[in-house]
């Protein structure tokens, strides 16, 4: 199968852990303060756990006090796409991997300078790659 063809649900289920599948493919959310990266401070790059696309730099990570990894900007303008999420009786901005369309988390307008944004991302949506 070409890398340009979308994966089937069965392929995603085979490749992802049940928790990753629930979050990445079913728009789930992990409980606060339980994910691997909420208190992670190493220098490197955070990538999509589903497809490996580079998403965030550790230099943009900050402690938001929310219990989820938080970033004030994506790695670049093409890394993360946004769409309106009206689930759970709220209107929010969902963050998705631009490459594979997997759910990452949400974007809120309460972050620090220079952007004022807070990308609130599920740890299960990420893999970390240390800087060499």
UniProtKB/Swiss-Prot annotation:
Where is Zn(2+) annotated to bind? 48, 51, 97, 100
Catalytic activity as recorded in UniProt: L-methionyl-[protein] + [thioredoxin]-disulfide + H2O = L-methionyl-(R)-S-oxide-[protein] + [thioredoxin]-dithiol
Per the record, the domain of life is Bacteria
Q: Which UniProt keywords apply?
A: Metal-binding, Oxidoreductase, Zinc
* GO BP: any one term: response to oxidative stress
Q: How is the cofactor bound?
A: Binds 1 zinc ion per subunit. The zinc ion is important for the structural integrity of the protein.
Keyword Zinc applies? yes
Query: According to the UniProt entry, what is the EC number of this protein?
Result: 1.8.4.12
May I have one GO cellular component term? cytoplasm
Task: Give the positions the UniProt entry annotates as the active site.
Answer: 120
The molecular function terms of the Gene Ontology recorded here are: peptide-methionine (R)-S-oxide reductase activity; zinc ion binding
Q: Kindly give the InterPro entries that the UniProt entry links to this protein.
A: Met_Sox_Rdtase_MsrB, Met_Sox_Rdtase_MsrB_dom, Mss4-like_sf
Task: Enumerate the cofactors the protein uses.
Answer: Zn(2+)
Residue ranges constituting the MsrB domain according to the UniProt record: 9-131
UniProt record similarity statement: Belongs to the MsrB Met sulfoxide reductase family.
Q: What is this protein called?
A: Peptide methionine sulfoxide reductase MsrB
Phylogenetic placement of the source organism: Bacteria, Pseudomonadati, Pseudomonadota, Betaproteobacteria, Nitrosomonadales
